[in-house]
Curated annotation (Swiss-Prot), chains A, B, C, D:
Keywords: Lyase, NAD, Nucleotide-binding. InterPro entries: ArgZ/ArgE-like (IPR005239), ArgZ/ArgE-like_C_1st (IPR048964), ArgZ/ArgE-like_C_2nd (IPR048963), LOR/SDH_bifunc_enz_cons_dom (IPR007545). Catalyzes the conversion of ornithine to proline, with the release of ammonia. The keyword Lyase applies. Pfam families: ArgZ-like_C_1st, ArgZ-like_C_2nd, Saccharop_dh_N. It is an enzyme of class 4 (lyase). Belongs to the AgrE/ArgZ ornithine cyclodeaminase family. This is Ornithine cyclodeaminase. Its EC number is 4.3.1.12. It catalyses: L-ornithine = L-proline + NH4(+). NAD(+) binds at residues 233-234, 312, 344-347, 365, 388-389. The keyword DNA damage does not apply.
Length: 407, 407, 407, 407
């Protein structure tokens, strides 16, 4: 039997961390004895717990401690982080540490270094005295990579307490809730975040490209509510097809019915943009006169269009190498405080994987399974709305305008 | 080898009836020889076809003719319908004819009698020289029931030709179409139907009971757009809970968050209405002050609430015997020209089964599979919209008001 | 400021009860001070907590205590339950207590009476010194009904600890899990429950009626694994249609393709069973020779077929009054230890509402949203499997047979 | 008023081509007069129709003819195809012809050239006297590109007539059909296609990677039923994780429950394969010992893993540039007779876009909307099965083995 003392501090009960700790120990067939347990007597007091954890042997104990570590357990005697060299590019030393999406610190040179660019399923390297969270494919030979859990501290975000829609809905999906009220609450969150100088990214799928939703997103960009647009080839092509031909995938967007020969508009649009030298040039030349991409370019809102194997064309601005696209997305997301995901599972999951746990996310999709999947990131900073994005966006824009008018 | 001559008349090619006829013959391993085929030379000319159908033997030929009959084939020498007596209540003679939902005529006494109250999966009886379509459980001993296909003529509706949303979308589901445009087109259909004195039934599930959608439906009733409401216990209870407590299933409908103890409101509502002696009395006594049921009662719009095994209570007006409820629904639907089905699969399918094929139906649901199922009634008079009914209804009301203002 | 002392005992942290208690107090803007908190030092030790709860005034404090009560809080000075008379049939006294689905006790005559037939959203009456949980419509004038929370004690079930699929999956949906492994685990649960003399009810929708699934369910009944079948008219009609005509809804069940004229089989089946005098008589007369209903009758497994407004016919055994059906279902479910819900949302939710929280439930449906909805009963005794019931049942039967052979 | 004579030949009525022709003319507000209409008198006789089509003016007539052309209309006086030079790489001449996925011929030098590599939404270029169907991004400066519809002939496939599952289910989705019978029919199709020397490609998503389904797919590859595997990084990583760690996304695949620290296995797997130099090398070195990728390599079945922005790693064999991946997929699909799509929307749609209309496709997914979307390719050569791929694959393998044993 091997034993080790661990301690926890924070809103232990409120955030269910202590419950999870006991669960982990029992699920792994470990034992525990609680030495001390101080619950905060008042609302804002932190709690503190100290316990001895028992394992069958060193390996078993180590396994338990690894899991406890991930939810914030501290092993009182502070040790330096353990490092090992990467033997080749993209090749990692044995037992390398895999990151969570929570804020993380490593004990290095007697100090707690914050890990920069934290996001999940990556590794930590120390370069020039700073700790970076990087994907496998950016590891270069000789990189000093963190191995094991020693000297690594994870700080899961506390549950939001003040009265916001995130606090109320945090981590849940609203398929039974009144959609219009949810949209009002989200409009308020967006408005207040922008008031405080926050930054918002929009991740959008091609379903956004029907008249009213497209116009609403274009208006949100024009009015300064969007700081970054992440999407793919299809969204841009459909958006530009509307501007050039007045059709979306060959359908007249005003009458909502197919235009004869309209299916060709899709490829004709791509060809026109390629001939012009890209989206920006096509806007300069007056070929594209309105819409989502137009407003991005005119208002200097950066956009990243990542390629997929479904793409026709693609448009010149599309980044066809997915690893390059992913890297650019990661960089562009730095400093973003909220991400609004609109009707795209692939892009939303990809972006979700690149975000730290404290970035607020709002996921909107008609399919409840998609929303549930997107929400499953172990964070209270996400809300899911199961609704029709084609009606959601115009209403969101209207609600924001109403709030603007009132304040 | 047995042969028989059959003939078809109408928009044969356009409505794919001729294609189906050949399909049926070949699927059943029959043979055919076309004797005459006149295609209408202009848009509105009917076509005419005459052919010999071959079967291996009498039974095989009969089988083929049975199927051809259902899509409108006529066997030129006109025979009287064949009748047989029901040996006991609810017991049918062998080989009884099963109805489709298309307009149907029977040759009786040398005349073509229209079959009254036609709807699918029922039987035809002749009473006092008139032909009625009735369900099995209404057959009484001695009823003269139609057996076989002889002397029965089915007239499937032609595809709508003029430029309406039914012609355009007829029989299809709009999950990829711009929702807002669809709603506009539906608003126009409703407006024009009412202008011409048409009658509209609404079939609604409890998902309608969130503030804006509920208010929109109540307003549509108040403004005379609804002639009949078909629903269940839950819709009425939630609607009344909002009126009495301001909550829906215990959630504050303005703030969209649960009210402490709110889960009790559901049963308290039921209890209050029972104590008052029913919905109508509760409105008279001023207990219920607004909402869907309130507007129905105040505007003399009939409603039928059919019971289900999920019901709490139920409210006194709920018909707990499903066969009684079904019979009342069938009667109330007589003369209805359009049915709007809102977020309820059980009630929508039940109502769909009671309708002739020429009644227009609009099905709205968030789940594409539900809409597809509801559409599957062999008619071009149905359109399906995959969207959030909570946003659909307020927008529909708005669009109708815009049309009213313009005209 | 008003204050009251409350206490909790049990696996407080493990079952998250303490977390919920603090949540409730803070959500309602109350305050608390923890007086004592003893965490069980070992796995099986219960925990104990005592705290003072503060409210703004009596009403506010009462509101908080009501909510705490529902999760098991005790107010140390024990008071008798408060009763009030029902002024008329189905009419309840003000402030009546609404039940949860957890085991509940009331303090009456100085003793703790267990509330019989507990299930959610009902009321408690005291009759002849015993406490009964009954629906509103069974309340009769003069019944002594529990009002308020005083003297009522709710005991939410502890989370299952031993290594079963319920412990592992408890309260979760398996859309990402290996279906075959899940089925194996469920087969073992069923086998072991029956070994111990447990009783199993099956709730089944008509989707079960395709060859292999129907045969598997019939075999499970024959082999004694089913003690009660709850379903509707459609399941029975399709099952019997297969036995009489070899078709299901007109499709040849061996070749999987429609049989000419097969759509009539549905009504012909109903007519034959009505003519025979019901399902049992039709089996006696040799009209029905195999299948689900056949095995129920032959093996004396009771079945309840509840009517719905979609029903054709219906068959004579169908209970067309939903309140009567519900009452019979409630009675039949007494003593059942596990309920398997197969591809039917309406019946599954109805049955779920009739069950105490400690009855194990297994929900199988292709639609993840349906499963999620069915699981949402505040219990760890439920598991959901998102899969095709047509493949699930044959495999389940196979796995049970493999376990039988091994043991 | 402008007029032009057109003619049609083939199974016009049976394939609904004539119906569609009339629809097109009427939808575009054109007029027609039928000059001749000969229906095949016997089952296998082709039909022939000749009609005059009227348009308001040249442009209108041209528009109608364009649409008629796409469904196979011939304009009797045969003209050479019209060509125009591409002014720059990836830049197309005005009015370029956009391909369908049906077999297509162009009239060039007095002869009908078959268009090679036909698939939808591409362009046709003439190079060295041969006609090629290529995507926009492969057009090079100076390419002679087909413009307009003149001299282009499209031959939509006739509906399958012999009694196969494709004939029966062609173009439809089986959510109400008995799954087990469908699987049997598909097993027979696969077996017979391989007997005749046909080639089968499998497109698979990561949901396949649960024990039984993975083992079944591996066995199908080993037994020679798969000639090409198209997938992404995730499928390969999970498959290899099972081989190395016995877990899939950190879950024990035998017990179906998470393994402590198992979430790391995902990245550890990627790292091990990168370190080995790729999948093939890792198999050679004995690191990977079984599974889908193992069988591909051991049995020389080519595989293409296309990258996506969700990918971790990725594995060295993954093609991260989507346009390169797409081109390789197109090449590999040459000569494939059947494609089985398993639980992946992105890859299935991408592959569907690369296929000619006569390649048989079988789409399996749990989500009915996904299957419906995949089927929507205007072909009768597709069948969709809504079921659980985790149970589908083992059963499919079993059924194929049963057929093998019998024959």
């Amino acid at each position: 039997m091997k034993a080790r003392e661990v301690e926890f501090e924070g809103h232990l009960i409120d955030s269910m961390i202590f419950t999870k700790a006991l669960d982990i120990i029992l699920d792994l067939d470990g034992e525990f004895e609680i030495l001390e347990f101080r619950v905060g007597k008042k609302k804002d007091d932190p709690s503190y717990a100290r316990m001895i954890v028992f394992g069958r042997d060193d390996a078993h104990l180590e396994q338990i401690l690894k899991e406890l570590h991930k939810i914030g357990a501290r092993i009182p005697d502070i040790e330096e982080v353990e490092l090992a060299e990467a033997p080749a590019d993209k090749v990692l030393p044995d037992g390398f540490y895999v990151t969570t999406n929570h804020p993380t610190f490593v004990r290095y040179g007697g100090e707690w270094l914050p890990v920069e660019d934290i996001s999940m399923d990556r590794v930590i390297v120390i370069r020039d005295g700073r700790a970076y969270c990087i994907p496998i494919d950016e590891v270069v030979r000789g990189d000093r990579v963190v191995v094991g859990e020693k000297g690594v501290r994870v700080v899961p975000p506390e549950r939001p307490r003040k009265s916001t829609v995130f606090e109320f809905m945090g981590g849940r999906v609203s398929s039974e809730r009144p959609t219009e009220r949810m949209i009002e609450a989200i409009a308020r969150e967006i408005y207040e975040l922008k008031l405080k100088g926050g930054k918002i990214a929009v991740v959008a799928g091609p379903a956004v490209d029907h008249t009213s939703a497209r116009n609403a997103l274009a208006a949100l960009i024009r009015d300064g509510y969007v700081d970054l647009l992440l999407s793919g080839n299809a969204l841009a092509v459909h958006d530009i097809e509307i501007s050039i031909f007045g059709t979306s995938l060959g359908m007249d967007i005003c009458k909502g019915r197919p235009v004869p020969g309209g299916n060709r508009h899709h490829l004709y649009t791509i060809s026109k943009v390629i001939a012009a030298g890209g989206i920006k040039k096509a806007i300069e030349k007056g070929i594209i006169k309105d819409g989502i991409m137009y407003e991005c370019v005119k208002n200097n809102v950066p956009f990243i269009l990542a390629g997929s194997i479904r793409d026709d064309g693609p448009l010149p601005e599309v980044i066809t190498d997915v690893m390059v696209a992913k890297k650019k997305m990661k960089e562009a997301l730095r400093g973003i405080n909220m991400v609004i995901m609109l009707a795209t599972m692939l892009h939303s999951i990809a972006v979700g994987n690149l975000l730290p746990s404290y970035v607020k996310t709002i996921c909107v999709d008609m399919n409840p399974s998609t929303v549930t999947k997107l929400m499953d990131r172990g964070t209270h900073q996400a809300i899911g709305v199961v609704t029709d994005v084609g009606l959601f966006l115009p209403l969101l824009y209207l609600k924001i305008k109403e709030i603007e008018a009132k304040e």
